[in-house]
Amino acid sequence: MLNFKLLNTDGNARRGQLTVNHGVIETPIFMPVGTYGSVKAMSPLELKEIDAQIILGNTFHLWLRPGNDIVAKFGGLHEFMGWDKPILTDSGGFQVFSLGEMRKITEEGVHFSSPINGDKLFLSPEVSMQIQRVLNSDIVMQFDECTPYEIDGRPATADEAAKSMRMSLRWAKRSIDEFNREENPNALFGIVQGGMFEHLRDESLAGLEDINFHGVAIGGLSVGEPKEDMLRVLQHVGPRLPANKPHYLMGVGTPEDLVQGVANGIDMFDCVMPTRNARNGWLFTRFGDIKIKNARYKDDKKPLDASCGCYACRNFSRAYLHHLHRTGEILGARLNTIHNLHYYLDLMREMREAISEGRFQLFVKQFHADRARGA
């Protein structure tokens, strides 16, 4: 089940409301990544406290560990991980793409060796839909082939990107057929592929519109291409996505990427960047980024960001966070993660308000000025 209501627009930016089986999601929204059914360093309670409305789980990794049989005993991923709000699961396509030499792609699906124990495994549109049915995620992604930016050390040609994209379209049809056969009560999104080629992206989108998914995602970006190529494709595809459906930009990215995405009609984002960077001591703030391990912070009494209302900024100094990071204390990773995710989710809230009030362009201008100021 999925209902998408468009509440306001400001240029191409959209303010909406997405209703799925486990609740209502205010868009545009950022989805923290919980690869193994856990957002690293965060409890479900802490996620709710920073206003996370939906999280992402990883079909491929959850299939390998703990396995579908375990999750099935709990009635799905929500019950298994103790999270009662919406969940989106990716299809496993990107993870299989990331295996490189360990996998073989055929029309039927992908044969690969488990990165855990070397077992021979097979993932196809049908298998991906079956796994996601057991996970009972609110939003299911079609199984696709993520077109690589580079093949054999050079950018993929139009012919290579076309071949990959057309197979993803055939897999899209098989995905929705299996989704319907299983009478899955949740929502299914299609994925626009086509590499760096606008005409292939158009062909992919047209094919997905014929299949009629509940929502549509842009895949195959942030896979090693130059930033200008990513923006070119985003600016071409984003405004062409169907107005009555939610738009999801997969695996992207920096705060600047989120603002650029919203400006081009994107409603949903996910990325490991705020959580992974937090564990590495890279913190995002309204006024630029902070690398907390730098010695300049060892006696800095200021909070990370005086304008931030997160638990870390309300209670601790940069000096203390520097100390925790240098000593490898687990609390450091936790506080850093709370801060980064709070910053990302607060940025989305500010964009929702700006779109509702018809001042999104002013917001973008102020956002860039603040970020350039330096923390």
Curated annotation (Swiss-Prot):
Q: Which residues bind Zn(2+)?
A: C308, C310, C313, H339
UniProt region (RNA binding), positions on chain: 251-257, 275-279
The UniProt entry annotates the active site at D90, D270
Cofactor comment in the record? Binds 1 zinc ion per subunit.
**Residues annotated for substrate binding in this entry:** D90, S91, G92, G93, F94, D144, Q193, G220
**Group of enzyme by EC:** transferase
Q: Where does this protein act, in terms of pathway?
A: tRNA modification; tRNA-queuosine biosynthesis
Spell out the molecular function terms from Gene Ontology. Answer: metal ion binding; tRNA-guanosine(34) queuine transglycosylase activity
Q: Which UniProt keywords apply?
A: Glycosyltransferase, Metal-binding, Queuosine biosynthesis, Transferase, tRNA processing, Zinc
- Which terms in the GO cellular component ontology are assigned? cytosol
- GO annotation terms (biological process): queuosine biosynthetic process; tRNA wobble guanine modification; tRNA-guanine transglycosylation
Q: Which reaction does it catalyse?
A: 7-aminomethyl-7-carbaguanine + guanosine(34) in tRNA = 7-aminomethyl-7-carbaguanosine(34) in tRNA + guanine
Q: Does the keyword Zinc apply?
A: yes
Enzyme Commission number(s) of this protein: 2.4.2.29
Domain of life here?
A: Bacteria
**Cofactors required:** Zn(2+)
Q: Which PANTHER family match?
A: QUEUINE TRNA-RIBOSYLTRANSFERASE
Assembly information from the UniProt record: Homodimer. Within each dimer, one monomer is responsible for RNA recognition and catalysis, while the other monomer binds to the replacement base PreQ1.
Q: Give a short account of what the protein does.
A: Catalyzes the base-exchange of a guanine (G) residue with the queuine precursor 7-aminomethyl-7-deazaguanine (PreQ1) at position 34 (anticodon wobble position) in tRNAs with GU(N) anticodons (tRNA-Asp, -Asn, -His and -Tyr). Catalysis occurs through a double-displacement mechanism. The nucleophile active site attacks the C1' of nucleotide 34 to detach the guanine base from the RNA, forming a covalent enzyme-RNA intermediate. The proton acceptor active site deprotonates the incoming PreQ1, allowing a nucleophilic attack on the C1' of the ribose to form the product.
Output the HAMAP family linked to this UniProt entry.
Q_tRNA_Tgt (MF_00168)
Q: Which family does it belong to?
A: Belongs to the queuine tRNA-ribosyltransferase family.
Name the UniProt record assigns to this protein: Queuine tRNA-ribosyltransferase
Instruction: State the organism named in the record.
Output: Herminiimonas arsenicoxydans
Which lineage?
A: Bacteria, Pseudomonadati, Pseudomonadota, Betaproteobacteria, Burkholderiales
